[in-house]
Amino acid sequence: MTTDAVGGVWTYSAGLASALAAAGMEVHLVVVGPPPGQEKRAMLRDPRIRLIESNLALEWQDAAGDDLPDARRFFEDLEDTIQPDIIHLNSFREANFDWFAPVGVVAHSCVNSWGLACQDTEWLSEQKWQHYTRAVAAGLNRAHAWVSPSQSFHDIICGLYRPSSPGTVIWNGISPAASPPDSKRRFILSAGRLWDAAKNVSALARASRGLDWPVFVAGPQSDHPAYDRGELILIGNLSHSALRSRMQHAAIFVSPARYEPFGLSVLEAASAGCALVLSDIPTFRELWDGAALFVDPADDCALHQALAYLCGDDRERARLQRAASERSERYSLARTAEAYRALYQRLLATQSRSFTPQNIEVHA
């Protein structure tokens, strides 16, 4: 299983690898990009998970494919050494390599869908990004199966790349949080890369002015563009355990994101009993309709009003906290792992005969 230690893919892959290992599988978790720090390594406690570092470039950081020859050699040698039964790729380009084992690709994100959501696409016509686009499309077609973490993002991928097989949807999942304290604290929490336009933190900064409660934002702050921070309290890039601890105490969690293929931090906040205020985008509607307040991500005034309303209405806030917690149980790690195990079994069953990707239908 490939992964990266830069964003939410690490949380997803560490959780899934741990669940698969607990079910008796041996997982070789191969890191592409910068190596994980000690806190992230500590998330891998099962001895049946072997962590392998590659020193290869991340797909979106090597749009022109300069690193591809080294990556191809690295993975060919690794497959020859390990002799895996299944190749689970959490990026696209590696699906174009010559694998012996059946290959599944998970579409966690892509540069083209990010650009469209952020209305920032002019640079995608550059030659290196055209190369990236062709590699993504080829990887989806070359894989024996491909997966999306939400139906909404599945539809986006289909519209952008027209893959030859229909793909399937397996929702991400997490282990349940510890029971939240009896009394939540009166603060609002958000999380995301401040420099990432998709996270829309600048809208939250504008909406934060005049709120009765403090608004804390966790996430990396380096290299982000200058903007008016409003009344946000920036608390930096917390460890995963520290962020989940904050969620245990936060009364409200807000994500005004313009783009989110799934949103693991929202799920973690819901599991911790936070009331959710979310941007009205298809992914969040799919996953949280009826269990959150929704606002137009382009309407700062509506975002301010929604947050002010929940700060002042104890009954509605408590109702949404319960609704989010109950909905989060739908997205369990156990259910996700079982869906992937079923997918792997179908891939193995087709290995010895003519393979047709359309035959695979696995849903969580």
Question: What are these model-predicted stretches?
Answer:
Residues 3-6, 22-65, 153:
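N-terminal strand-loop element at the rim of the active site
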Residues 86, 98-121, 126:
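Active-site proximal beta-strand in glycosyltransferases
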Residues 111, 125-146:
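Membrane-proximal helix-turn-helix segments that form the acceptor-binding/catalytic region
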Residues 140, 245-250:
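Short alpha-helical donor nucleotide-sugar binding micro-motif in glycosyltransferases
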Residues 141-142, 154-174:
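Helix-loop-beta element that forms the nucleotide-linked donor phosphate-binding surface
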Residues 180-199, 205-212, 216:
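Conserved donor-binding/catalytic core segment of Leloir-type glycosyltransferases
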Residues 236-237, 278, 292-301, 309-314:
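Conserved acidic donor-binding segment of nucleotide-sugar-dependent glycosyltransferases
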Residues 258:
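Aromatic "clamp/platform" in nucleotide-sugar-dependent glycosyltransferases that forms part
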